[in-house]
Amino acid sequence: MKISHMKKDELFEGFYLIKSADLRQTRAGKNYLAFTFQDDSGEIDGKLWDAQPHNIEAFTAGKVVHMKGRREVYNNTPQVNQITLRLPQAGEPNDPADFKVKSPVDVKEIRDYMSQMIFKIENPVWQRIVRNLYTKYDKEFYSYPAAKTNHHAFETGLAYHTATMVRLADAISEVYPQLNKSLLYAGIMLHDLAKVIELTGPDQTEYTVRGNLLGHIALIDSEITKTVMELGIDDTKEEVVLLRHVILRHHGLLEYGSPVRPRIMEAEIIHMIDNLDASMMMMSTALALVDKGEMTNKIFAMDNRSFYKPDLD
């Protein structure tokens, strides 16, 4: 049974990927395993109580397992309980790739769209910078997630998030023609590109040392600066300063990691579009895991709010 199809208090069984497995202890000092399971429809947490040494050795992150259990809701959070686990037998599903959440849009379609939109960057300085960095990180950009957790945290999530933002910018610029389309496109295409440096990759994603210590905003600004030097572009040109500005401030507030606040329209719009797409993905992901008439689990990145799934046709 798919995770997104599980109903409250329903017994289920099926094959799932262990996304994470943490060994913990109860107050009484007994071992238990805290899991996050996933399939291509979503994720759900569960615990294996009184974990024995052979359980701890066998059920590790990255492995596919057969699981029986009951889907429950605790503190508005869906979870699986009363679980029994075993490893797959010969002939049963065991390829982790089959259990990963995938982009709703095929990566080839995303690649074709992004290539098309790069041509629409009319400013030659911005287009050269974008082309250079997209060539440098082509493989990583079209495979990495956009985050370890929260929004677009799946393989190709980075490219899907970026392409969706470009689509939104394209539509918004028709309503507000005073916006510079080329700056919007270039800024969006580069704003999260350094996630390919900040994160380890699409499998069991973690932060790299540079990701932990510097973060993707500082990393992409450094990449742009190096690219400008390599291309022989004057780094004091207004185009370079504006491009760096819209990227440095795309988190909006200083407390969210941006070193400066937005000072031009395009910077403000990119921040809003980024927040819109991230919020929609987080809400949609959480709502897919609950039934109509239920609340989602609390979403930490959205002020720890729960969201209601209307009981409507």
Where are these regions (language model features)?
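Acidic/His-rich, divalent-metal-binding segments that scaffold phosphate/diphosphate chemistry
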Residues: E92-L213, K237
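N-terminal intrinsically disordered, cationic/polar leader segments
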Residues: K68, H271, A288-L289, G293-D313
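Divalent metal-coordination and catalytic microenvironments
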Residues: Y16, G62, M165, D274
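Structural detector for short beta-strands of small beta-barrel domains
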Residues: E10-R27
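Divalent metal-dependent catalytic cores for phosphoryl transfer on phosphate-bearing substrates
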Residues: N150-H151, Y160, A171-V290
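Short, acidic/hydrophobic/Gly-rich beta-strand patch recurrent on exposed beta strands
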Residues: A34-D39
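OB-fold nucleic-acid-binding modules
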Residues: M1-F12
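OB-fold single-stranded nucleic acid-binding module
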Residues: D22-N31, I44-D45, A51-A97
